[in-house]
UniProtKB/Swiss-Prot annotation:
It comes from Naegleria fowleri (Brain eating amoeba). On the 2D-gel the determined pI of this protein is: 7.1, its MW is: 46.4 kDa. This is Unknown protein NF003 from 2D-PAGE.
Length: 20
């Protein structure tokens, strides 16, 4: 799901922190 994570990170950079 690395691709999805990258897409979400681009769409929602703020959520990236949360995802990680």
């Amino acid at each position: 799901y690395a691709e999805l994570k990258a897409i979400l990170a681009k769409q929602i950079p703020e959520k990236q922190a949360x995802i990680n």
